[in-house]
């Protein structure tokens, strides 16, 4: 497991956890992952998350995955901007993910937010991932 792209590792952990119908997954700690988890929680894609620690300096998150009628709530989660090819957009040119049914998570100068909030605030940025 390479940590050259921790966001991709995090998204893959969610995808694999839901494919194997796990209720809880463990992901590494970072401020970016914390912000993404807060967005996923506020939009209703996960049931919750808690920050835990092992020893004095090893932190991680326990994420409760959400299911509806036995099927995962997140049907697709994908990394858009990658370390080798960054993807930026302005507030005017920001696309809608699945015609507004899904959401993009954007890293802006005002913090990490959903595409709806970025459009509302009038800021663009790097498109981190898409969730549907």
Swiss-Prot record:
Function: One of the primary rRNA binding proteins, it binds directly to 16S rRNA central domain where it helps coordinate assembly of the platform of the 30S subunit.
Gene Ontology CC: one annotated term: ribonucleoprotein complex
InterPro entries tied to this protein: Ribosomal_uS8, Ribosomal_uS8_CS, Ribosomal_uS8_sf
Subunit structure: Part of the 30S ribosomal subunit. Contacts proteins S5 and S12.
Molecular function terms, GO-annotated: rRNA binding; structural constituent of ribosome
Disulfide bond sites: none
Protein name, as recorded: Small ribosomal subunit protein uS8
């Amino acid at each position: 497991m390479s940590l050259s792209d921790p966001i991709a590792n995090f998204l893959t952990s969610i995808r694999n956890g839901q494919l194997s119908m796990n209720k809880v997954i463990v992901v590494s700690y970072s401020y970016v992952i914390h912000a993404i988890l807060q967005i996923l929680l506020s939009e209703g894609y996960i049931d919750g998350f808690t920050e835990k620690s092992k020893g004095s300096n090893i932190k991680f998150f326990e994420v409760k995955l959400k299911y509806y009628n036995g099927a995962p709530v997140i049907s697709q989660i994908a990394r858009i901007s990658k370390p080798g090819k960054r993807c930026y957009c302005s507030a005017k040119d920001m696309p809608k993910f699945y015609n507004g049914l899904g959401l993009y998570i954007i890293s802006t100068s005002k913090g990490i937010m959903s595409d709806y909030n970025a459009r509302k605030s009038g800021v663009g940025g790097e498109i981190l991932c898409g969730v549907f």
